[in-house]
Amino acid sequence: MAKRFTLSEAQRLIPEVDRMLREALDAKSEYQDAERVIQEFTEHVMMMGGVLVDRDRALAARSLRDEAASRLRERIEAVLETGCLVKDLDIGLVDFPTLFRGVEVYLCWKLGESGIGFWHGVDEGFRGRKAIDQDFLDHHQGDRPQ
């Protein structure tokens, strides 16, 4: 069973999740840059019929790509280990499972927002976000202490 958060529990995780998402986005950008260099080498070789390329530079690009992919994977896994769900890395969209009136819903946060101010049903997604109001505050709950 997935962890369910209270609003305050999820809010406390925001600084850590923010940092990890930014690190993941940096790694993704580095991966894409290295992949472009590799693609350029590949296209150059194909166009020139196997002409020699700067082997050291090509190997360095592959190494950078692989290191960035590893960092990206590690950062995403670290975010997921907190119990929240990465819905869209590119915009930094994260959901935190919770219960509202006994039904599982998600607290919704996006990179750049100062805190969690929205929630939505599990099938509604970002477009179905609703502002957290007093009714939600009065009737949502995380996991019960064991």
Walk through the language-model features, giving the residues of each.
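Glycine-rich, aromatic-bearing surface loops/beta-hairpins
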Residues: 66, 73-146
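Alpha-helix boundary/capping detector
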Residues: 36-37, 43, 57, 105-106, ...
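A short, surface-exposed helix-loop junction/capping segment
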Residues: 49-61
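Heptad-repeat coiled-coil alpha-helices
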Residues: 33, 37-40, 44-47, 54, ...
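Long, hydrophobic N-terminal alpha-helical segment
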Residues: 1-44
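Amphipathic alpha-helical coiled-coil segments
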Residues: 17-34, 61, 65-68, 72-75, ...
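Short, flexible coil/linker segments at or flanking structured domains
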Residues: 5-8, 12, 19, 53, ...
